[in-house]
Each structure stands twice: as structure tokens, then as C-alpha cells.
């Protein structure tokens, strides 16, 4: 009887551990879907104008990049900024909402890290968005290349086999 209770208790603890927060994440992998895949090319179209949301997207892009590498897949990422995100990837803080200024520094730091990370082939800023958001090309973070038109760039990447993701 005591042995049955002990076995039941151990089983209950094991089930609880498997269902604990983070347990599924620790066991999750993408082996099945990545079977036979050696490289993934993705163009991320970033328009998020909320600093917290933009920083979150950049963090998840980096997490995805690192996860692919860990699973033996070479990422080829391009990150393209346009729309309201434009104000958060430049240095003129008068263009950034006061409540977003602290996070703008964290965004700049994350972009610096991403620009040096294996698997990130380019980070771009649309000049059409610069004009529409009333910012200046010379204020774009130095790690970001100012291009003519992100739509044209994104179309070109897709024609070269890049998947399109707008997180």
C-alpha cells in the first residue's frame, strides 16, 4: 500500500514537472519541420511604432536566429524597417515619444547586436518612410543601411527566395 502511494506520488510529480511553465519550451524543438533544411532565408518587414512592441519583435527575431543555428540550420535574415518603426531606429530623440525614449536606447543596442550576429545579412531603413515620418537619413542608426524603397527591396528579396514575415 505504501509502495503504491509512493509510486503514485512520483508519477504525479513527474506529470506536474512536465506541465510546469517552461517544461514544454525546454522539450520543444523543430526537428521534424526542419528535417533536410540547411538554410532559411527570411526578410522581416518591421513597422511596429510602439517601443515595447518593437523591442519584443527584435528579441524574438534574435531568439529565432539563435534557435535555427542551434538546430543546425543557417539563417539568412534581412530586417527592414519602415512606417512608424522609423522613428524608433534613429537618433533624434525629439522625434521619439517621451515614454519611448528609454526603450529607444535598448532598441539601438539590440540593433547593434543583431548587426554583428551570424545569420543577419542586412538591416535596412526605407527612405520613403523617412520622408513620411519626417525624420532624416543622417539620423538613422549607423548599423542600418538607408535604401530607396522597402517595398521594392522586400519584393526583390522574395524573388531571391526569401520568405516574407511581418511580425
Residue ranges and their predicted role:
Residues 24-167:
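Secreted/extracellular ectodomain signature
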Residues 15-23:
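C-terminal segment of classical bacterial N-terminal signal peptides
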Residues 1-10:
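Bacterial N-terminal signal peptides that target proteins for export
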Residues 10-11, 64:
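Enrichment for repetitive, rod-forming helical segments
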Amino acid at each position: 500500500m505504501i509502495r503504491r502511494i509512493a509510486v503514485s506520488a512520483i508519477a504525479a510529480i513527474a506529470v506536474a514537472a512536465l506541465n510546469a511553465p517552461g517544461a514544454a519550451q525546454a522539450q520543444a524543438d523543430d526537428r521534424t519541420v526542419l528535417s533536410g533544411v540547411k538554410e532559411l532565408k527570411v526578410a522581416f518587414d518591421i513597422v511596429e511604432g510602439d517601443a515595447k512592441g518593437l523591442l519584443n519583435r527584435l528579441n524574438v527575431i534574435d531568439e529565432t536566429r539563435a534557435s535555427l543555428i542551434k538546430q543546425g540550420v543557417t539563417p539568412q535574415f534581412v530586417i527592414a524597417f519602415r512606417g512608424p518603426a522609423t522613428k524608433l531606429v534613429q537618433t533624434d530623440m525629439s522625434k521619439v515619444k517621451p515614454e519611448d525614449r528609454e526603450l529607444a536606447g535598448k532598441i539601438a543596442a539590440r540593433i547593434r547586436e543583431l548587426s554583428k550576429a551570424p545569420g543577419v545579412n542586412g538591416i535596412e531603413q526605407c527612405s520613403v518612410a523617412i520622408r513620411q515620418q519626417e525624420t532624416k537619413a543622417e539620423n538613422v542608426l549607423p548599423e542600418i543601411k538607408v535604401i530607396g524603397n522597402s517595398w521594392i527591396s522586400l519584393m526583390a528579396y522574395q524573388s531571391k527566395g526569401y520568405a516574407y514575415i511581418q511580425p
